């Protein structure tokens, strides 16, 4: 048996000295004499494949590993089911000339493409190889990605991209730029058709950032993943600002501040585990339902702890995540954008084994108020769920939209409308649960019946109104309070009157805006029965090209 290293040495020995620069990349082996038998042809193929699979640049490989990063093939092995990967495009090579390009033709051209399985389900994958010209994209590299996305679109399977590259290959000029354009167009065409996941495992700079930005979910690994359109050197040259790569576009920055990263992991293996976990909640394409996984958690299980988790006084905060955990199967859920816009929660979970998307105000952060970031975070999540046939459950405890000059000038009118638009357009089953306060326009936006929720239920702690009693009293009873002999006492009386007449738990139900007032302990069983009913829901919108969402 011939060892792979022996094959590699044999081929390297055959290669004549290259002329010009080769940047340390191993040149392709010469074609040689045509094999005389099939067996000889198979042996030649094995030798050629061994060379193609070996690192093209030993020095670049050492530098890559010194950063604590896995090589791209090891990444695919850890992400996919064992032995499931099938590669295409292994022998693809660039055809560029000039700038020393003709002296080096690494097999694969810097990107690995193919398909495999995760939990037995087909996925298409690509992995940038940062050891080949920094992972920069050229024309052939791009063509491999185009083919992969076309196959995923045709076969109806998710696409996972392991990103570790430096943008367009400068030496290939406009051909590289056109390659990115073709990639972006395919990302958009596949949007809402098959799940697209981007994993940032190194640099993702310049035009390269827009492909992950167009996909459904972006994962980043702390310490090695970073994303920016212009790097620290350009920022310093143009603006004079001093900033590190991590501060400018590191994983924590995009998870906490920009919302670009939906998930952040401490290391690559943890990241791959999260990718696999997320896929377990998603269908392979928009014509399928998410996979059902029944855990044995009884559908009629009462959630008695909810009465202790949620205080009756709507001024007292609590953690909505505890409410979600109490209701869903086995208390398990996957939160999306956990550290961005923390005043709203977006999570994937299961009820009676069926996947649901949960949107909930978070009273523990900013009292659960809706602001720009919360609106955009929830809007994107709602649209993702609607794209992939995931029913929506909305847990409401909202005092309104966040007031202030900063929010108004940052366009909360337009950007807050995104959540309203997303809910109104969604055709999946939609159920609203009013936990406590539901005030003003924010109540409407949080999937009220008036904008199309299929069913609305409220707890006896609900207080639904245009605004809270204290604020309302200052407006509608202003003259009466001012004319009173004891304004403080009169104001308190009028506040209680407002609460009695307009904020009692039964007003919304009496007027048909809520379908029932339920015991909080029955929330799980009510949701499961309602979702079973709505599984047969059919909804068709008007004939149109597309709506004009307030982007």
Where are these regions (language model features)?
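Ligand-binding clefts of soluble mixed alpha/beta catalytic domains
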Residues: 2-551
């Amino acid at each position: 048996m011939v060892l792979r290293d022996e094959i590699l040495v044999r081929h390297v020995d055959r290669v004549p000295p290259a002329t010009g620069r080769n940047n340390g990349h191993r040149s392709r082996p010469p074609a040689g004499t045509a094999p005389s038998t099939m067996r000889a042809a198979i042996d030649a193929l094995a030798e050629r494949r061994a060379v193609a699979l070996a690192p093209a640049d030993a020095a670049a490989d050492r530098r890559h590993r010194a950063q604590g990063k896995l090589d791209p093939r090891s990444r695919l092995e850890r992400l996919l089911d064992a032995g499931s990967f099938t590669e295409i495009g292994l022998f693809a090579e660039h055809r560029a000339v000039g700038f020393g390009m003709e002296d080096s033709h690494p097999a694969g051209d810097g990107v690995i493409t193919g398909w495999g399985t995760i939990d037995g389900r087909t996925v298409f994958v690509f992995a940038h190889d940062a050891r080949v010209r920094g992972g920069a994209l050229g024309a052939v590299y791009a063509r491999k990605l185009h083919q992969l996305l076309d196959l995923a679109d045709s076969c109806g399977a998710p696409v996972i991209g392991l990103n570790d590259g430096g943008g367009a290959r400068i030496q290939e000029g406009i051909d590289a730029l056109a390659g990115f354009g073709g990639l972006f167009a395919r990302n958009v065409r596949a949007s809402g058709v098959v799940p697209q996941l981007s994993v940032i495992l190194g640099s993702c700079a310049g035009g390269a950032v827009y492909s992950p930005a167009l996909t459904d979910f972006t994962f980043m690994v702390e310490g090695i993943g970073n994303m920016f359109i212009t790097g620290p050197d350009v920022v310093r040259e143009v603006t004079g600002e001093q900033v590190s790569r991590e501060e400018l576009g590191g994983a924590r920055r995009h998870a906490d501040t920009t919302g670009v990263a939906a998930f952040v992991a401490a290391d690559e293996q943890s990241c791959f585990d999260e990718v696999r976990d997320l896929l377990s909640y998603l269908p392979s394409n928009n014509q399928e339902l998410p996979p059902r996984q029944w855990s044995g958690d009884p559908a009629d299980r009462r959630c008695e702890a909810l009465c202790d988790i949620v205080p009756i006084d709507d001024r007292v905060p609590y953690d909505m995540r505890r409410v979600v955990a109490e209701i869903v199967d086995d208390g398990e859920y996957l939160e999306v954008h956990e550290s961005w816009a923390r005043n709203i929660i977006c999570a994937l979970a299961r009820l009676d084994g069926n996947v649901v998307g949960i949107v909930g105000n978070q009273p523990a952060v900013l009292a659960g108020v809706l602001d720009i970031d919360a609106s955009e975070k929830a809007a994107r999540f709602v649209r993702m769920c609607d794209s992939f046939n995931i029913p929506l459950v909305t847990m409401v405890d909202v005092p309104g939209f966040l007031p202030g000059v900063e929010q108004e000038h940052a366009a909360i009118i337009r950007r807050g409308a995104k959540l309203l638009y997303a809910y109104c357009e969604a055709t999946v089953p939609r159920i609203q649960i009013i936990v406590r306060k539901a005030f003003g326009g924010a109540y409407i936006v949080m999937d009220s019946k008036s904008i199309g929720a299929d069913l609305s239920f409220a707890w006896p702690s609900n207080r639904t109104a245009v605004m809270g009693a204290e604020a309302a009293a200052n407006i509608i009873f202003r003259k009466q309070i001012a004319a009173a002999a004891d304004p403080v006492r009169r104001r308190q009386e009028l506040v209680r009157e407002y609460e009695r007449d307009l904020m009692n738990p039964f007003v919304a139900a009496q007027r048909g805006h809520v379908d029932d007032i339920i015991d909080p302990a029955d929330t799980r069983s009510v949701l499961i029965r309602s979702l079973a009913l709505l599984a047969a829901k059919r909804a068709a919108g008007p004939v149109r090209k597309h709506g004009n969402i307030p982007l």
